[in-house]
Amino acid sequence: MLSPCLAAPATECRDPADAPAAPARHTGPARPRKRRPRNWKPHLPRERLLERGPAALTDAELIALLLGTGGGGRDVFASARALLARFGDSLRDMLDAEPDVFATHPGIGTARSAVLIAVTEIVRRALVEKARERLQIDSPGAVEDYLRLRIGTRPHEVFVTLYLDARHGLIDVEESARGSLTRMAVYPREIVRRALVLNAAALIIAHNHPSGAVQPSAEDRRLTRVLHEALALIDAKLLDHVVVGTADTFSFARAGWL
């Protein structure tokens, strides 16, 4: 007598043990699949930045990403290269440029100029913050580097005061006055009053010369003398007056004028 399996068609008498295993089912939450946009072009700066990091891009390509489009029918990469070339291919010189320079460059315009100005200001503030964290008052070079970074490229005169404690630790940094290209109103009594409020034992004052020249004027020397004498009345000391240019500084203390 034949077994039912032998009598049945081959497809119906297959041993269950020989049947292929059913694929395992994923019972957990669906796993997200990384999908690239349909217009993904791995050779373009944006895509290379996302895949390989910003170090993979040239200076001009980074600028092109900020510009977004070239404007006025211009190629964005050509606009970025031309803008960088205007500053001798120097990102530092570009960051130090006057804000209105960007808007007047062909293909940039107001909107793109605003983006560039915002980025340069973000970079400047980050560098100032980092320099302040590392600032050592007992190191004249570090103080001058900090001041040059903070006010060296300002288009107008700015007066800055560093208030220090008895151990020359930094209490606060304040911009006490701002002025025109050639004139600025500084009130010693306000600086002395602020020193009393902060209980400061010593001060360093500084201002910039937008012209770039750091030679002190007669008015600079007079202000230094008046403030030095006023601070002495409250037992506080003026440690230095630093005149800041775009690339250099002048220290009253180093010159022996304090």
Curated annotation (Swiss-Prot):
Domain of life: Bacteria
Residues binding Zn(2+): H207, H209, D220
Protein known as: UPF0758 protein Bamb_2548
A GO biological-process term: proteolysis
Biased amino acid composition, Basic residues: 31-43
Swiss-Prot/TrEMBL keywords: Hydrolase, Metal-binding, Metalloprotease, Protease, Zinc
Disordered, as annotated region: 1-43
MPN domain residues: 136-258
UniProt record similarity statement: Belongs to the UPF0758 family.
Gene3D superfamilies: Cytidine Deaminase, domain 2
CDD domains named in the record: MPN_DUF2466
GO molecular function, one term: metallopeptidase activity
InterPro entries: MPN, RadC_JAB, UPF0758, UPF0758_CS, UPF0758_N
One family name in Pfam for this protein: RadC
Positions occupied by motif JAMM motif: 207-220
